[in-house]
Structure formats: structure tokens, C-alpha cells
Amino acid sequence: MIELGINIDHVATLRQQRHTAYPDPLAAAVRAEDAGADLITLHLREDRRHIQDADVYAIRPRLRTRMNLECALTPEMLEIACAVKPSDVCLVPEKRAELTTEGGLDVLGQFDAVADAVALLTEAGIRVSLFIDPDAAQIEAAARAQAPVIELHTGAYAEAEGELAERELERIRAAVDVGLLHGLRVNAGHGLHYGNVQAVAAIDGISELNIGHAIVAQAVFDGWEKAIRDMKALMIQARAR
């Protein structure tokens, strides 16, 4: 069964826009689990633009499912991850000027640093995922770095249309095959929404999709729980075909 990770970053974005105490990411996480989320994903960025350190520490002990903490490959973030001990840490690239994560982690270009981080987090009892582009060389490097999980960046597919979207989808399919060949758990995410999720969810071998912005946006109209249930239903329907 394919799993749905609910990214709560943009619940925190709404809060930070006015520097209020609401909406509370912890409440969003708990209610997401009630609605069927299989895990809760949150990105503690270096610039703290949405999720704050206090959120991470407050949410971790309250979850009944899993916490998937996204963070950059920096000493500060690795120290926080080891202190919090989430079930999973997904290492992602970060640029301060970006609106959202723009590309995958360059495992090849910083192999030693990635391998060291994987070893550190694994020693702390944390499963490590690397957020990478659907590229065979990067996947092979992730396997050599001893990461047990990869998350394929689906942004190029999400932004494409027509024939280009189909080509990007084929890249994802091929990347899944490479990941499985290397014994990796393969997840995916970025830019997925109600109109494009099923093509990705239908790919055998993908274990988990992490989705946030689209669900937060739909919740404005339908409510948080319904927005989550509807997304999960689309994923399950696609996988059952």
C-alpha cells in the first residue's frame, strides 16, 4: 500500500505571515493523523521561514505515526536531528533565496559529506532519505553512501505539460527501477497536487508520496481532514488500477 506523508510546512507559513500563535502545526499534525496520514513531514530550514525549532520538539513526542524531518546538510541541522531523533530524516539542498526546494541534493558533488551525514544519523537510530533528482548517477551515489531511502524530486514532472510531462514521468519510472535495483526504498514528492498525483502514485515501487502545499490550499475550501482523505483516496485508487 502506498503511503501519504503530509507536509505541514505551509500551515506554519500561514502562522509566520502574521507572527501569531495560530494555526498550530502540532494541531495540524495530530488532525492529519486522524484523517489517515501515514507520516508527518516538516522542513526545518536554516532561515526558519516556516517551521521553527520549537515546532519540531513539540510535534515529535505527540505523533502516533512517523516524523519525517527534512533538513539541510549542515552541522547545526544534523545536531538538531540527532537530538530530536525523528523516525526519518530527509536531507535536502537549500538556497536562502528560493521559494521552495528547487532541485535534488547533489550526492555526487558532495559525496563524502553526504556519506558522513548518513553514517552519523544512522548511528543515532534514524533512517536516512536523500532528496534527489530522478537521475541514475545520483541514485547510484546514494546507494554507495549507504542511504537506505531516496525521495525522487517530482518538480520537473509537476511543472511540465503534455508530451514533456510524459517524458518526465518516464524519467521517474526509470529512476524507481534503478533505486529498487540497488535495494533502496523509493519515495517521491514535490509539486504534486490533486490533478497530477495519480500518474506518480500508479508507479509500482514507490512506497510513499510527500505532499503539502496542495493539501493546505485545498483545505481552505474543503477542510483539513477532507483534503487529506481525498488525496489519499486518489493515491490508493491509482495504485489499485
Swiss-Prot record:
One cellular component (GO) term of this entry: cytosol
Positions of 3-amino-2-oxopropyl phosphate binding: 7, 18, 191, 212-213
CDD domains recorded: PNPsynthase
Gene, per the UniProt record: pdxJ
Family indicated by similarity: Belongs to the PNP synthase family.
GO molecular function ontology, one term from the record: pyridoxine 5'-phosphate synthase activity
Residues the record marks as site: Transition state stabilizer: 151
UniProt keyword Cytoplasm present: yes
Entry annotation: catalytic residues: 43, 70, 190
Reaction(s) catalysed (UniProt annotation): 3-amino-2-oxopropyl phosphate + 1-deoxy-D-xylulose 5-phosphate = pyridoxine 5'-phosphate + phosphate + 2 H2O + H(+)
EC number of this enzyme: 2.6.99.2
Biological pathway: Cofactor biosynthesis; pyridoxine 5'-phosphate biosynthesis; pyridoxine 5'-phosphate from D-erythrose 4-phosphate: step 5/5
InterPro entries to which the protein is assigned, alphabetical: Aldolase_TIM, PyrdxlP_synth_PdxJ, Pyridoxine-5'_phos_synth
Name of this protein: Pyridoxine 5'-phosphate synthase
Keyword rRNA processing: no
Keywords: Cytoplasm, Pyridoxine biosynthesis, Transferase
BP-aspect Gene Ontology terms: pyridoxine biosynthetic process
Organism: Bordetella avium (strain 197N)
The protein's role, per its UniProt record: Catalyzes the complicated ring closure reaction between the two acyclic compounds 1-deoxy-D-xylulose-5-phosphate (DXP) and 3-amino-2-oxopropyl phosphate (1-amino-acetone-3-phosphate or AAP) to form pyridoxine 5'-phosphate (PNP) and inorganic phosphate.
Subcellular location, record wording: Cytoplasm
Subunit architecture: Homooctamer; tetramer of dimers.
Gene3D superfamilies, per database record: Aldolase class I
Positions contributing to 1-deoxy-D-xylulose 5-phosphate binding: 9-10, 45, 50, 100
Major localization listed first in the record, in broad terms: cytoplasm
